[in-house]
């Protein structure tokens, strides 16, 4: 699943491709890609112009004046620019056809991604954004906020970070990475972390998100940006996907377990309970 650095990379590559373009019409080839009524989606967007492409955590926000399209890529969602009349691939589910003859298409092999049309300004009340915590590596993600939030929660730290309810934007890749960097066992209850561990984890989250974004995200399966380019942070990963390989810090082999249904790789020596 694209995490915050990947979605930010998509946003940055999408912005120059679509901002200023006016929608002639919208084609929807898979109705379930739309949260809400597909016909309303098509009707309301006709004649609208893309004014900005924003992001919150893992969500893209396409701004069209008084309307916003909130897009969650989920596991495999991708956007790319093409033309109205280009052949439609079986994994392409929607296109914004622009008045200049180009089109922005949404493709999704798994069909998990969703787009929702809302009035601009209501996106944090009526979409999945309403359930999210503050963004990682943002001014709102203060150390005192993080400390207080952790103290109120007894679930294990891996599951809490994956839930997006305290801090939003991290997924399986970066959670494994930041816990390893902080020497925290992923099964540790959040409210049992020491003050030093919380401080280390807070720093690791911010630094990892910033660095991964600088490298264009991580491509370990199929992630591509809007220009069709892969990320490069996979070359920097220390723990994710390295089950059975030696920990670069202590030399002990990484192990992999499941926590809340998600594969979790960590070092038994460096990340003791």
From Swiss-Prot:
<feature type="active site" description="Proton donor; for beta-elimination activity">
    <location>
        <position position="58"/>
    </location>
</feature>
<keyword id="KW-0326">Glycosidase</keyword>
<dbReference type="InterPro" id="IPR010979">
    <property type="entry name" value="Ribosomal_uS13-like_H2TH"/>
</dbReference>
<comment type="function">
    <text>Involved in base excision repair of DNA damaged by oxidation or by mutagenic agents. Acts as a DNA glycosylase that recognizes and removes damaged bases. Has a preference for oxidized purines, such as 7,8-dihydro-8-oxoguanine (8-oxoG). Has AP (apurinic/apyrimidinic) lyase activity and introduces nicks in the DNA strand. Cleaves the DNA backbone by beta-delta elimination to generate a single-strand break at the site of the removed base with both 3'- and 5'-phosphates.</text>
</comment>
<dbReference type="GO" id="GO:0140078">
    <property type="term" value="F:class I DNA-(apurinic or apyrimidinic site) endonuclease activity"/>
</dbReference>
<feature type="active site" description="Proton donor; for delta-elimination activity">
    <location>
        <position position="262"/>
    </location>
</feature>
<keyword id="KW-0479">Metal-binding</keyword>
<dbReference type="InterPro" id="IPR035937">
    <property type="entry name" value="MutM-like_N-ter"/>
</dbReference>
<protein>
    <recommendedName>
        <fullName>Formamidopyrimidine-DNA glycosylase</fullName>
        <ecNumber>3.2.2.23</ecNumber>
        <ecNumber>4.2.99.18</ecNumber>
    </recommendedName>
</protein>
<keyword id="KW-0227">DNA damage</keyword>
<feature type="binding site">
    <location>
        <position position="153"/>
    </location>
    <ligand>
        <name>DNA</name>
    </ligand>
</feature>
<feature type="binding site">
    <location>
        <position position="110"/>
    </location>
    <ligand>
        <name>DNA</name>
    </ligand>
</feature>
<dbReference type="Pfam" id="PF06827">
    <property type="entry name" value="zf-FPG_IleRS"/>
</dbReference>
<dbReference type="InterPro" id="IPR000214">
    <property type="entry name" value="Znf_DNA_glyclase/AP_lyase"/>
</dbReference>
<keyword id="KW-0511">Multifunctional enzyme</keyword>
<keyword id="KW-0378">Hydrolase</keyword>
<keyword id="KW-0238">DNA-binding</keyword>
<feature type="active site" description="Proton donor">
    <location>
        <position position="3"/>
    </location>
</feature>
<comment type="similarity">
    <text>Belongs to the FPG family.</text>
</comment>
<dbReference type="InterPro" id="IPR010663">
    <property type="entry name" value="Znf_FPG/IleRS"/>
</dbReference>
<dbReference type="Pfam" id="PF01149">
    <property type="entry name" value="Fapy_DNA_glyco"/>
</dbReference>
<comment type="subunit">
    <text>Monomer.</text>
</comment>
<dbReference type="GO" id="GO:0008270">
    <property type="term" value="F:zinc ion binding"/>
</dbReference>
<dbReference type="InterPro" id="IPR015886">
    <property type="entry name" value="DNA_glyclase/AP_lyase_DNA-bd"/>
</dbReference>
<dbReference type="Pfam" id="PF06831">
    <property type="entry name" value="H2TH"/>
</dbReference>
<keyword id="KW-0862">Zinc</keyword>
<feature type="binding site">
    <location>
        <position position="91"/>
    </location>
    <ligand>
        <name>DNA</name>
    </ligand>
</feature>
<keyword id="KW-0456">Lyase</keyword>
<dbReference type="GO" id="GO:0003684">
    <property type="term" value="F:damaged DNA binding"/>
</dbReference>
<dbReference type="GO" id="GO:0034039">
    <property type="term" value="F:8-oxo-7,8-dihydroguanine DNA N-glycosylase activity"/>
</dbReference>
<dbReference type="InterPro" id="IPR020629">
    <property type="entry name" value="Formamido-pyr_DNA_Glyclase"/>
</dbReference>
<keyword id="KW-0234">DNA repair</keyword>
<dbReference type="GO" id="GO:0006284">
    <property type="term" value="P:base-excision repair"/>
</dbReference>
<keyword id="KW-0863">Zinc-finger</keyword>
<feature type="active site" description="Schiff-base intermediate with DNA">
    <location>
        <position position="2"/>
    </location>
</feature>
<dbReference type="InterPro" id="IPR012319">
    <property type="entry name" value="FPG_cat"/>
</dbReference>
<feature type="zinc finger region" description="FPG-type">
    <location>
        <begin position="238"/>
        <end position="272"/>
    </location>
</feature>
């Amino acid at each position: 699943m694209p995490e915050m650095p990947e979605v930010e990379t998509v946003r940055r590559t999408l912005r120059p491709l679509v901002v200023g373009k006016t929608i002639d019409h919208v084609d929807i080839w898979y109705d379930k890609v739309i949260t809400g009524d597909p016909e309303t989606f098509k009707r309301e967007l006709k004649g609208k112009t893309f004014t900005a492409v924003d992001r919150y955590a893992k969500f893209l926000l396409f701004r069209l004046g008084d309307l916003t399209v909130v897009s969650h890529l989920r596991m495999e969602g991708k956007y790319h620019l093409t033309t109205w009349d280009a052949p439609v691939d079986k994994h392409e589910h929607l296109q914004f056809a622009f008045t200049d003859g180009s089109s922005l298409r949404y493709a999704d092999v798994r069909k998990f991604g969703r787009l929702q049309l809302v009035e601009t300004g209501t996106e944090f009340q009526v979409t999945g954004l309403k359930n999210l915590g503050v963004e990682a590596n943002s001014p709102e993600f203060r150390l005192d906020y993080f400390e207080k939030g952790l103290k109120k929660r007894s679930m294990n730290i891996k599951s809490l970070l994956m839930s997006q309810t305290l801090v939003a934007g991290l997924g399986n890749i970066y959670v494994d990475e930041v816990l390893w960097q902080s020497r925290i066992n992923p099964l540790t209850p959040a409210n049992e972390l020491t003050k030093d561990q919380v401080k280390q984890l807070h720093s690791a989250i911010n630094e990892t998100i910033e660095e991964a974004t600088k490298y264009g995200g991580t491509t370990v399966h199929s992630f591509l940006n809007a220009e069709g380019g892969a990320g490069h942070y996979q070359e920097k990963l220390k723990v994710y996907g390295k089950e059975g390989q030696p920990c670069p810090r202590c030399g002990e082999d990484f192990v992999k377990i499941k926590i809340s249904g998600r594969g979790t790789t960590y070092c038994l020596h460096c990340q003791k309970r």
